[in-house]
C-alpha cells in the first residue's frame, strides 16, 4: 500500500508514525485501485489518509539503495499481503525506529548465519574449533588470572564438550540439507579459481612452493640459465599443480621419468604436449643435451634454487614487464626476446655492459636469437632496445681489460667475434626491421644498412667516430655507407665522425622513416603487424632479390675490416689510442 492510500479507521493505533513532507507516488496499480482517493484542497497540506497511515505499518521486510544513494525500506502494511508491499524513503519512517531496529537486527543475524554456514560447509572441524576457541576465550576473559584445576577444570571441560556436541547436532541437519540441494535448479554457480601456476612458464626448478611464499626481490633477480650440474628436481603434474592451489584434491598425475640425455626436440615436445615445463628448455646446454631426471612422487616444499655464476650481478628492473612471461625471454642475459604472432622481437638490454654496448657475450646472444628466428615460423625480426639508447657500439672497457693480458691473442678473438656477428646479419634470409629509439654509435650505426628497414625516433642520432675511438671502421660501413649516402657524406661520417640527426639520416638514406617520440612504439608495432601478415615466402624472396649481388661483396668487406681491427688492436699505438679515448670520456664525465 502506498502513502496515498487510505486505511479503515477501525484499525488500532500503533506507536509508529510515518511522516511525509511531499506527495509520494505509488507504482502498484492494485494499490491504487483498492485505495480511497484522498481529497486535499491545498497541495501543501497532508491528507487525513496520509496522516492516518502511520498506524498501518506492520513490519519492515527489506531495504535498498536508490539511484541517488538514499536508503529505502520495503514496508509491509497491516491488512495487506506481500504483493502490496511498497518501498518508502527513510525520511518517511523517522518515527518507526522500532521497526527499523528490528529489521536491522534480523538482517545482521541472517548475515552471521550465512557466514557460519559457509565456514561449516568448507570444514565442519574448523567450525567446531572456532566455537571451542570462542568459548575458551569467554571463560578466560571472565577470570584471566585464575588457574583452573581439579573439579573446576573438569566441569568447564565438560561444559565445552557439551557445547561442541550441541553445535554438531544442530549443524548436521542443515549440512545434510545442503548436500541434497540441487544446485542446477537453484541457479547457484560454483566458480573454481584457476591456478595462476597453470599456463605460467616456470623459469627455474622450484620444488612445490606456492607463489605467495616467493620473495618479490628474488623473483625479479631470477637468472634463467641453468647449468648441467643442476640437481634433480621434482616437477608437478597438472593434477598436483591444481591440488597445490586448493582447487582440486591432490592427484598424483605422474610425469614420465626422464633419465639420460634430453635433446632439444624432446624438450620441445614435452613443452608442446603440456607434460613438461620450461626447465627442460632452460637446462639445455650449448651442445643441446643435458642429463636430468624428474618425478612428482615425494614432492616436498622447498626454496627456489638458482644455479648461475652471474646471479650476484644486479638485475635490470627495466625488464619487469610482460616480456618476462614468455619462455624465450629466459634464455638470455643481455637481450630480451619476445616471440609474437608472425615475428620475433629482439631487444638489447645489456647487463654486462653499459648503454647497450656490444661485447662478445652480447653478440653471441644476438646471433643465437637470430638463428632461432631463422629456424622457426617467424616471418621477420624486429630489433630494438630497452631504455633511451639504442646501441653505443663496442664495449671498449671490456676490450681494454682483455687486451692488457695478451694483446695479440685477445685482439684476434675480438676481431673474430665482430666478424661472426656481422656475417650473421649479412646471411640472414628473413627481413630485419630496426626500431632506433635513441643514439646509435659506432657498430650500432654501422649494422643498420645491413638490415632491411630502419625506423627512427625523432630524438635518435647517428655517429661513427672511429678515428676518435682509435680504430678503423667496422660493420661493412666502408661499403654500405658510400652506396647509401654517397662518398662525400660517408667520408664525413667515417673519418671526421659527423653526427646526424634522425631527419638528416632519413634524408641521406640511412633511415627509412622518422616518427614522433610520443607515438614511436605504436607506429612501429602497427607497421610490423602489417608486414607480419604478408606471405613469408614473398618476403624472403624479395629480400634475396635485393641482396643477391651484395652478399659476397659484404662478406669480403667484413673480412678486410676485421683484419684491420686485429692489426690495430694488436699494436701498442692502437692500445694507446683506445686508452686516450677512454681517458677523455672519463674527464668529460
UniProtKB/Swiss-Prot annotation:
EC number: 4.2.1.-, 2.3.1.-
Recorded superkingdom: Eukaryota
Stated induction or repression of this protein's expression: Down-regulated upon neuronal activity in response to an enriched environment, NMDA injection in the brain or seizures induced by kainic acid (at protein level). Up-regulated after social defeat stress.
Keyword Ligase among record annotations: no
All residue ranges annotated as the Chromo domain in the record: 55-115
Biased composition regions of type Basic and acidic residues, renumbered to the chain: 11-30, 206-216
Modification type N6,N6-dimethyllysine: residues: 129
Biased segments, Polar residues type: 1-10, 132-143
Alphabetically ordered keywords of this record: Acyltransferase, Chromosome, Differentiation, Lyase, Methylation, Nucleus, Phosphoprotein, Repressor, Spermatogenesis, Transcription, Transcription regulation, Transferase
A GO biological-process term: spermatid development
PROSITE patterns xrefs: CHROMO_1, CHROMO_2
Positions in coiled-coil regions: none
Domain notes: The chromo domain recognizes and binds histone H3K9me3, histone H3K27me2 and histone H3K27me3. The acetyl-CoA-binding domain mediates crotonyl-coA hydratase activity. The acetyl-CoA-binding domain is required for recruitment to sites of DNA double strand breaks and for binding to poly (ADP ribose) moieties.
UniProt subunit comment: Forms multimers and multimerization is required for stable binding to chromatin. Interacts with HDAC1 and HDAC2 via its C-terminal acetyl-CoA-binding domain. Interacts with EZH2, EED, SUZ12, REST, EHMT1 and EHMT2. Part of a complex containing at least CDYL, REST, WIZ, SETB1, EHMT1 and EHMT2. Part of a complex containing at least CDYL, MIER1, MIER2, HDAC1 and HDAC2. Interacts with CHAF1A and CHAF1B; bridging the CAF-1 complex to the MCM2-7 (MCM) complex. Interacts with MCM3 and MCM5; bridging the CAF-1 complex to the MCM2-7 (MCM) complex. Recruited to Xist RNA-coated X chromosome.
Protein's UniProt name: Chromodomain Y-like protein
Source species of the chain: Rattus norvegicus (Rat)
Amino acid at each position: 500500500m502506498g502513502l496515498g492510500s487510505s486505511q479503515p479507521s477501525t484499525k488500532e493505533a500503533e506507536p509508529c508514525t510515518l511522516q511525509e513532507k511531499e506527495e509520494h507516488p505509488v507504482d502498484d496499480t492494485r494499490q491504487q485501485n483498492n485505495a480511497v482517493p484522498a481529497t486535499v484542497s491545498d497541495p501543501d497540506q497532508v491528507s487525513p489518509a496520509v496522516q492516518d497511515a502511520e498506524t498501518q505499518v506492520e513490519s519492515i521486510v527489506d531495504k535498498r539503495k536508490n539511484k541517488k544513494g538514499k536508503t529505502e525500506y520495503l514496508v509491509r502494511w497491516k491488512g495487506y499481503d506481500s504483493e502490496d508491499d511498497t518501498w518508502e524513503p527513510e525520511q518517511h519512517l523517522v518515527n518507526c525506529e522500532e521497526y527499523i531496529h528490528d529489521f536491522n537486527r534480523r538482517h545482521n543475524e541472517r548475515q552471521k548465519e550465512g557466514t557460519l554456514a559457509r565456514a561449516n560447509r568448507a570444514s565442519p572441524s574448523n567450525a567446531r574449533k572456532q566455537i571451542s576457541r570462542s568459548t575458551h576465550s569467554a571463560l578466560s576473559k571472565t577470570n584471566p588470572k585464575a588457574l583452573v584445576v581439579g573439579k573446576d577444570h573438569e566441569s568447564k571441560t565438560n561444559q565445552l564438550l557439551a557445547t561442541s556436541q550441541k553445535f554438531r547436532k544442530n549443524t548436521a541437519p542443515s549440512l545434510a540439507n545442503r548436500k541434497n540441494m540441487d544446485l542446477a535448479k537453484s541457479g547457484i554457480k560454483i566458480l573454481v579459481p584457476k591456478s595462476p601456476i597453470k599456463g605460467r612458464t616456470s623459469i627455474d626448478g622450484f620444488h612445490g612452493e606456492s607463489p605467495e611464499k616467493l620473495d618479490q626481490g628474488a623473483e625479479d633477480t631470477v637468472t634463467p640459465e641453468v647449468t648441467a650440474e643442476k640437481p634433480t628436481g621434482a616437477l608437478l603434474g597438472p593434477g598436483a599443480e591444481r591440488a597445490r592451489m586448493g582447487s582440486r584434491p591432490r592427484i598424483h598425475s605422474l610425469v614420465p621419468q626422464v633419465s639420460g640425455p634430453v635433446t632439444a626436440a624432446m624438450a620441445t615436445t614435452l613443452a608442446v604436449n603440456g607434460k613438461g615445463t620450461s626447465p627442460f628448455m632452460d637446462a639445455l646446454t650449448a651442445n643441446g643435451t643435458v642429463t636430468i631426471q624428474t618425478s612428482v612422487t615425494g614432492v616436498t616444499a622447498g626454496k627456489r634454487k638458482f644455479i648461475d655464476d652471474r646471479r650476484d650481478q644486479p638485475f635490470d628492473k627495466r625488464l619487469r614487464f610482460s616480456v618476462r612471461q614468455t619462455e624465450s625471454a629466459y634464455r638470455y642475459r643481455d637481450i630480451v626476446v619476445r616471440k609474437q604472432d608472425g615475428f620475433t622481437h629482439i631487444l638489447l638490454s645489456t647487463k654486462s655492459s653499459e648503454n647497450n654496448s656490444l661485447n662478445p657475450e652480447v653478440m653471441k646472444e644476438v646471433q643465437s636469437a637470430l638463428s632461432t628466428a631463422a629456424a622457426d615460423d617467424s616471418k621477420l625480426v624486429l630489433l630494438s632496445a630497452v631504455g633511451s639508447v639504442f646501441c653505443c657500439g663496442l664495449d671498449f672497457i671490456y676490450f681494454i681489460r682483455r687486451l692488457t693480458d695478451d694483446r695479440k691473442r685477445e685482439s684476434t678473438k675480438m676481431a673474430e667475434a665482430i666478424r661472426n656477428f656481422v656475417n650473421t646479419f649479412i646471411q640472414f634470409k628473413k627481413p630485419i626491421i630496426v626500431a632506433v629509439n635513441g643514439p646509435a654509435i659506432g657498430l650500432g650505426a654501422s649494422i643498420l644498412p645491413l638490415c632491411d628497414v630502419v625506423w627512427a625516433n625523432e630524438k635518435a642520432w647517428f655517429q661513427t667516430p672511429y678515428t676518435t675511438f682509435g680504430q678503423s671502421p667496422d660493420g661493412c660501413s666502408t661499403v654500405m655507407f658510400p652506396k647509401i649516402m654517397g662518398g662525400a657524406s660517408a667520408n664525413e661520417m667515417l673519418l671526421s665522425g659527423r653526427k646526424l640527426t634522425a631527419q638528416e639520416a632519413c634524408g641521406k638514406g640511412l633511415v627509412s622513416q622518422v616518427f614522433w617520440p610520443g607515438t614511436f612504439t605504436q607506429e612501429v608495432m602497427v607497421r610490423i603487424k602489417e608486414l607480419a601478415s604478408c606471405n613469408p615466402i614473398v618476403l624472403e624472396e624479395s629480400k634475396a632479390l635485393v641482396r643477391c649481388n651484395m652478399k659476397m661483396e659484404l662478406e669480403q668487406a667484413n673480412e678486410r675490416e676485421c683484419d684491420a681491427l686485429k692489426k690495430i688492436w694488436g699494436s701498442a699505438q692502437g692500445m694507446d689510442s683506445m686508452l686516450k679515448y677512454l681517458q677523455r670520456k672519463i674527464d668529460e664525465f
